[in-house]
Amino acid sequence: MNIYVEANPYLHDKYSKYADEKYKREGNPFVSFPIHFDDIPSGAKTLALTFIDHDAIPVCGFSWIHWTAANIPAYIGELPEHASEERQDLMIQGQNSFASPLAGSNDPKVIHQYCGPTPPDKDHAYTLTVYALDAELNLQPGFYLNELYQEMKEHILAETSIELLARV
């Protein structure tokens, strides 16, 4: 399985810290980047994804979850730009780290959707992982990352990751 996101080598500003203010909510970028999928294994029914900043550990003490989504149709070929907000029919989305009491947001449009990179201290590498699954997962909107991992456990046919950079 392959995934492709346009980045040279940085994620486009529109999807990260330097997004125009009209593409920010509570100071954070909300337009999700397009993701292209190919060589999906036969037998895959759905895809799931995680977008996580492990470089956040020295800053806040834990890996920062920017996006989780599940039950994306395996046949889709591409998750289009801004799908997190405009194509919610294509997936269910979980909570990101802004849902934490440490971050303090309670706006569902911030905590239950893509919230793009805003590295505070240096350029960060963000890990996008896509999973091909043999089933639709029994998750509700606003699920937690650990629930996604638990539900996927016996259903992963393939998994692939890429790192995307965002500038400070």
From Swiss-Prot:
It holds the Pfam family PBP. It comes from the Bacteria. Disulfide bonds: none annotated. This is Uncharacterized protein YxkA. It comes from Bacillus subtilis (strain 168). The gene is yxkA.
